[in-house]
Amino acid sequence: MNRNEILFDRAKAIIPGGVNSPVRAFGSVGGVPRFIKKAEGAYVWDENGTRYTDYVGSWGPAIVGHAHPEVVETVCEAALGGLSFGAPTEGEIVIAEEIAKIMPSVERLRLVSSGTEATMTAIRLARGFTGRDKIIKFEGCYHGHSDSLLVKAGSGLLTFGNPSSAGVPADFTKHTLVLEYNNIAQLEEAFAQSGNEIACVIVEPFVGNMNLVRPTEAFVKALRGLTEKYGAVLIYDEVMTGFRVALGGAQSLHGITPDLTTMGKVIGGGMPLAAFGGRKDIMECISPLGGVYQAGTLSGNPIAVAAGLKTLEIIQREGFYENLTARTEQLVQGFRTAADAAGIEFTADSVGGMFGLYFAAHAPRNYADMARSNIEGFKQFFHGMLDRNVAFGPSAYEAGFVSAAHTPELIDETVAVAVEVFKAMAE
């Protein structure tokens, strides 16, 4: 047995499923997960000492590359001053001001430690602000693992959702309406039927949890128009897309001003940090100013804030997003060409430093489209690349990520590996 196998067996004896987040167990692709020992730049090394070119990027945060020397130095310096205080710090103010400068929709902001905390609190805040209970989410969009959002679509188009996890009471989800992404007719009907009861709509403005799915321009406009018409809060869940698809997030590309925004991943620079923010009148409903309660022992942790501030500084340097976007487009175009040459039905898409790979003729517009793609084809591709030391997320439903550490030469090397894999798949 190699070290990965030994550690996985050992982990399963003490950690449920052997992992601390389900997708890491390789359940949807089969095989043994790689236990990572270290990471640097565009690479990760497993416990066997094998180096992989990494397109997981810690599921998005590693936008400047793993263990960026400036970020590491900043974290080490901050740690010398203490690891956690449970009290306000100047750094909290500075990072909130910086985010508000980059993302003008954020008039007030609060820091938390995880994306789940951010979305959970944003939902609570929207309900407290509007005095309404019902919420709309979209099938295939993931907003963390709070009870109200662990919901799958009901049996009919406009039935309220069913729990998608054991342990979630039906009473928690009866207020959650699950609609099809990019389906304007369903959205209009939902508001026509229940508009005055809907507290908020929460949406991934580019979906990253049913692979990368783009919204149509008309869908985005309908989201903003209907929420404004009925007095519902529009929540952009930019935990994944914020500072990843563009400096100002997806909202800057859409030209949309959401009422609330949740963010995470990139803003922590690899450390546990997330936030929610938006309109002043809504945000001031949060305790201690208002009656909506939220708290956290490690919220605004000084080490995470330091890492986040340095990362935000780096990504604002000249040419950062132009180069990131070019490298990501180079990757997906190379993959499309390689698959076409091998006669494999495949396409790919990207926005900023985020990309999607689809074993289908066309990129999906919603969850049903994605579910019809060739999942077995993805599994073959995933293992073919992994066996050749290139790592992607172990699920056909996860987007991938390019970092500033991925050079044009490294992208070319990855495409050359994909040429081999697609040829092998075609044989």
Curated annotation (Swiss-Prot):
Main localization category: cytoplasm
Any Pfam family: Aminotran_3
Protein's cellular compartments: Cytoplasm
GO biological process assignments: protoporphyrinogen IX biosynthetic process
Cofactor(s) this protein cannot do without: pyridoxal 5'-phosphate
UniProtKB keywords: Cytoplasm, Isomerase, Porphyrin biosynthesis, Pyridoxal phosphate
EC number per UniProt: 5.4.3.8
NCBIfam families: hemL (TIGR00713), PRK00062.1 (NF000818)
Annotated family: Belongs to the class-III pyridoxal-phosphate-dependent aminotransferase family. HemL subfamily.
Name by which UniProt lists this protein: Glutamate-1-semialdehyde 2,1-aminomutase
Species in which this protein is naturally found: Neisseria meningitidis serogroup B (strain ATCC BAA-335 / MC58)
